């Protein structure tokens, strides 16, 4: 499949079921290591989490047939990570999440386009800092975020291989 025919746009309420299906498949495929369970609260509440708040958004990548092959989301960071409590000025910090690309389409610039859209959105909504966490075991995840200008603030290591990263806008 060529990337030139793909459409990247903010999701709408009618996209929720297909985006949920895509995300749940990605989570099953990527978080299958023993003892790991992906957190899916936001997946089941996409509308409430990413569509209703004006300072949040989610984008999806669609094939011409309407199949979801990628996603990325921005929401206001809520100081939920215990190890980082108090680090961020909350009104000015956004959290990047749910950035996944179908395995057959990775390394073709789609993720970078999504990051560009998220960055533009964040600047328009007054965010000054982007926070995310990733895992060393995710294919291309950690290296991708470093190439996008994110810096490590905490590498937890351990079986979940969690790395916390940030980027100042």
Roles of regions detected by a PLM:
Residues 17, 108, 139:
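Loop/helix-junction capping segments adjacent to catalytic residues or to phosphate/diphosphate-binding pockets
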Residues 29, 107, 120-124, 151:
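Conserved amphipathic alpha-helical interaction elements at protein-protein interfaces in regulatory
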Residues 3, 25-29, 88-92, 128-131, ...:
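C-terminal "cap" of GNAT-fold acetyltransferases
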Residues 10-16, 21-97, 102, 115-117, ...:
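Acetyl-CoA-dependent GNAT
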Residues 70, 109-111, 149:
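Conserved phosphate-binding and hydrolysis motifs of nucleotide-dependent enzymes
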Residues 102-104, 108, 136:
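Active-site acidic-Proline motif in GNAT/NAT acetyltransferases
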Residues 102, 113-129:
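Conserved acyl-CoA
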């Amino acid at each position: 499949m060529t990337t030139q025919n793909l459409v990247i746009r903010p999701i709408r309420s009618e996209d929720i079921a297909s985006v949920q299906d895509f995300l749940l498949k990605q989570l099953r495929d990527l978080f299958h290591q023993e003892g790991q369970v992906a957190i899916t609260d936001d997946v089941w509440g996409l509308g409430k989490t990413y569509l209703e708040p004006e300072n949040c958004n989610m984008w999806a990548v669609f094939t011409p047939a309407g199949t979801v092959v990628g996603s990325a989301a921005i929401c206001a960071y809520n100081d939920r990570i215990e190890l980082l409590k108090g680090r961020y000025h909350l009104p000015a910090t956004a959290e990047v999440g749910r950035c996944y690309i179908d395995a057959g389409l990775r390394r073709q610039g789609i993720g970078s386009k999504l990051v560009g859209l998220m960055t533009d959105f964040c600047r328009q909504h007054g965010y000054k800092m982007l926070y995310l966490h990733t895992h060393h075991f995710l294919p291309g995840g950690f290296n991708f975020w470093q190439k996008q200008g994110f810096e490590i603030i905490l590498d937890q290591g351990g079986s979940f291989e969690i790395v916390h990263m940030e980027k100042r806008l």
